[in-house]
Amino acid sequence: MAPLRVERAPGGSRLGVTRAQRPTALCLPPLLLLLLLLLGAVSASPESLNQSLPESQNQSHPTEDSLVSKGKMEDYETHVLPCWYEYKSCMDSVKDWCNWTLISRHYSDLQNCLEYNADKFGLGFPNPLAENIILEAHLIHFANCSLVQPTFSDPPEDVLLAMIIAPICLIPFLVTLVVWRSKDSDAQA
């Protein structure tokens, strides 16, 4: 770390400066630092930026493209809602909503309908309405589904003892067998 020197600023206050003539960090009281931090956070928030604009600038005027897009979204919504109602009626007949094999066809049909109609009306997929429908489906039907992983437990004591004792008993037998066979091969040589 570079050693510090203290120099006087042109206004007369003392500043810490490193040997490379770079000023050191200002030493401000913690309360003042906290106040500055809070003021910076409040003034930089998007809400405060929007409030500082005049109201005439906050309201955007609809353009021809936005009206056409809004009309497409309304048409898209009228064509997609029957898909949603069909999905809901099919899901109501399913007993286990967390079993993917039972619900995958209905879920895929809903997604295909959303995608097909988005392409038909020249909208991208996913779009805000499709996202809302999919989110609604997840909140209604899959909120209580979680990944169920099997929990492993210890085997019963008799099985556990057999699994421990069997290798312990086999080791002396195998050592005896190896020694006996090595003596036998030495005797033949």
Curated annotation (Swiss-Prot):
Pfam families: RAMP (PF04901). It is found in: Cell membrane. Residues 180-189 are cytoplasmic. GO terms for molecular function: adrenomedullin binding; adrenomedullin receptor activity; coreceptor activity. Residues 45-157 are extracellular. One of its GO terms (biological process) is regulation of G protein-coupled receptor signaling pathway. Coiled coil: none annotated. Residues 49-69 are annotated as: Disordered. It is a single-pass type I membrane protein. The chain crosses the membrane at residues 158-179. It comes from the Eukaryota. Keywords: Cell membrane, Disulfide bond, Glycoprotein, Membrane, Receptor, Signal, Transmembrane, Transmembrane helix, Transport. Residues 49-61 have a biased composition (Polar residues). Residues 1-44 form the signal peptide. Heterodimer of CALCRL and RAMP2; the interaction forms the receptor complex for adrenomedullin/ADM. Heterodimer of CALCR and RAMP2; interaction forms the AMYR2 receptor complex for calcitonin/CALC and amylin/IAPP. This is Receptor activity-modifying protein 2.
